[in-house]
């Protein structure tokens, strides 16, 4: 097909939008792919919609190739199915809730596990119907507290979500492996740089869970990779190697000291070394101190939040994402001044595990805080710290938690060297849900022996509209976007850069021949626009190939520009065949 720029609904911008922070947001707006309607809500203009449809086509091809069957559920859903799984409550404020005119509760679907499970229950009842994989490409809604970065973190977005149903755990393993491979093919075809990372299951539940993270310095997720081996994980899923337990017999008793100058960990360490405190015969370091972070935890459905103490070594900061992932689906926030005022036993800056336990506050510790480890920590009195407080003797945590930051150079699991940190954007997430949802909906199937059995379920999500933004993040330069042939709204951008009548007529002919060869062509036929503006727009819009008909056409030459690559001069009579071949090669 041919689309003429003279009639295309498009307005390019030379300046970045004021609210844009990341390159993808700036360029997608400037190039006329999207337009803001409200915070986190965007319209898809013709070029943007074509690119999204191209991504959807790749996704459909790969989903169909593994036996997926497409259907479509409504975005507007009743409350009852989500009550069955408790996610009406667990989703908290991120759920868009509404009532109809009769007062019945509804929601805008953030995800559709409930609907898939309930539908399979309604329609299937025999093992002969399984395995089955169903998927949809549907608009989703989440009330993000701080929507940002354009369509990377929006309130309305398009996702592909698929669900496998198998009669056995071995069958689930096979379905999971098929989806994992399909996702790799999708992302490879789209030209993405990504990592497959171990992940937490969160509110989705289930066991095995992996994320596909697109590598990006603007990513909201931090992930780690081992320097040797193949280990990769979202930091939320990294498991800290526990400390070594020690015999508490014969350890010195804890001693409380006046510490008037100890407002920071560094100051506390300097004070300890100034009075020659020894830890295992060496000077004190920040790792020998114990931070007590007070947070408020509200379980789903609870009216009040409960205070909880989080213990971690003083050389580590609390990682709120790791903390939240460890306590999900509960909501977590740091204690504020009013909480300290309402609880006088909380002495800000000097909170310790002993005072928390005495006042009935749950205490969760970093895995390094094990029996026999000795710590310098708050004495629950202003300007006083205790030295030599021993875990398992002087205090005992109620449990352990992954809440401390992961640092570059930390040991990798299984002896695979050390960890390196990188940032990424989640583009896909696959789960082995098991029987959480099929049990909740009492999905009972007759097995080969005529006995009732509950099928096991996998969940596989992929962000379609987010993928477009991620590709813009990874594939751009100072001049504009740089799409792959799989994603580009048009494979070839034909530019009539010469007002000579013969060149304009030839440009028309080239566009027609390229279209006849099966390529999608964007033809810049604007008569009153200068060549310089046309070239700038071509770079901004980002089509992979641009065919320029300029002054050289009189000598039988045309110019081919590969976006982000080389410029070359082609013989006019061979240009179409060469471009068709180059597009075909770029697809492979």
From Swiss-Prot:
Substrates-to-products reaction catalysed: tRNA(Pro) + L-proline + ATP = L-prolyl-tRNA(Pro) + AMP + diphosphate
Family: Belongs to the class-II aminoacyl-tRNA synthetase family. ProS type 1 subfamily.
Protein name: Proline--tRNA ligase
Keyword terms, alphabetized: Aminoacyl-tRNA synthetase, ATP-binding, Cytoplasm, Ligase, Nucleotide-binding, Protein biosynthesis
Enzyme Commission number(s): 6.1.1.15
Subcellular location: Cytoplasm
Main location (coarse class): cytoplasm
Disulfide bonds: none
Any one of the GO BP annotations: prolyl-tRNA aminoacylation
Annotated organism of origin: Corynebacterium glutamicum (strain R)
């Amino acid at each position: 097909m041919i689309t003429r720029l003279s009639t295309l609904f498009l307005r390019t911008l030379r300046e970045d939008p004021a609210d844009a922070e990341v390159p993808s947001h700036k360029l997608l707006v400037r190039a006329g792919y999207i337009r803001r309607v409200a915070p986190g809500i965007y319209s898809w203009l013709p070029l943007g919609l074509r690119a999204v449809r191209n991504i959807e086509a790749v996704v459909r091809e790969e989903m169909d190739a593994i036996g997926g069957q497409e259907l479509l559920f409504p975005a507007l859903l009743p409350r009852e199915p989500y009550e069955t799984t408790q996610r009406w409550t667990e989703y908290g404020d991120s759920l868009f809730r509404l009532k109809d005119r009769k007062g019945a509760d509804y929601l805008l679907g953030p995800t559709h596990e409930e609907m898939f499970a309930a539908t399979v229950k309604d329609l299937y009842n025999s093992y002969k119907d399984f395995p089955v994989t169903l998927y949809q490409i549907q608009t989703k809604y989440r009330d993000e507290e701080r929507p940002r970065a354009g369509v990377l973190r929006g309130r309305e977005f398009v996702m592909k979500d698929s669900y496998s149903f198998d009669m056995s755990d071995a069958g689930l393993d096979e379905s999971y492996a098929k989806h994992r491979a399909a996702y790799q093919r999708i992302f490879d075809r789209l030209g993405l740089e990504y990592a497959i990372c171990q992940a937490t299951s969160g509110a989705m539940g289930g066991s095995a869970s992996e994320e596909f993270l697109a590598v990006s310095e603007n990513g909201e997720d931090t992930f780690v990779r081992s320097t040797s081996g193949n280990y990769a994980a979202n930091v939320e899923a990294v498991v800290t190697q526990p400390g070594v337990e020690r015999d508490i017999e014969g350890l010195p008793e804890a001693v409380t000291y006046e510490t008037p100058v100890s407002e920071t960990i560094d100051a506390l360490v300097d004070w300890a070394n100034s009075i020659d405190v020894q830890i295992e015969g060496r000077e004190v370091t920040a790792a020998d101190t114990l931070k007590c972070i007070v947070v408020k935890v509200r379980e789903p459905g609870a009216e009040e939040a409960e205070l909880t103490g989080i213990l971690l070594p003083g050389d580590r900061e609390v990682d709120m994402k790791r903390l939240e992932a460890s306590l999900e689906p509960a909501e977590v926030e740091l204690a504020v001044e009013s909480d300290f005022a309402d609880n006088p036993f909380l002495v800000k800056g000097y909170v310790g595990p002993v005072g928390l336990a005495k006042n009935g506050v749950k205490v969760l510790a970093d895995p390094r805080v094990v029996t026999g480890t000795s710590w310098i920590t708050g004495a629950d009195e202003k300007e006083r710290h205790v030295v030599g407080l021993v875990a398992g003797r002087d205090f005992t945590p109620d449990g352990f938690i992954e809440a401390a930051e992961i640092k570059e150079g930390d040991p990798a699991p299984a002896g695979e060297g050390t960890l390196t940190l990188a940032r990424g954007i989640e583009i896909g997430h696959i789960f082995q849900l098991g029987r959480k949802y099929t049990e909740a909906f009492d999905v009972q199937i007759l097995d080969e022996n005529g006995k009732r059995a509950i099928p096991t379920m996998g969940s596989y999500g992929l962000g379609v509209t987010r993928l477009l933004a991620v590709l813009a993040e990874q594939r751009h330069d100072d001049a504009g976007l740089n799409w792959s042939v799989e994603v580009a709204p048009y494979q070839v951008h034909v530019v009539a850069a010469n007002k000579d009548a013969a060149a304009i007529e030839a440009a028309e002919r080239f566009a027609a021949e390229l279209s006849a060869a099966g390529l999608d062509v964007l033809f810049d036929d604007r008569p009153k626009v200068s060549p310089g503006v046309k070239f700038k727009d071509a770079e901004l819009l980002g089509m992979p190939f641009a065919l320029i008909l300029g002054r050289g056409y009189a000598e039988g030459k045309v110019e081919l520009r590969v976006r982000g690559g080389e410029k070359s001069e082609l013989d006019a009579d061979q240009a179409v065949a060469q471009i068709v071949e180059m597009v075909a090669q770029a697809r492979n």
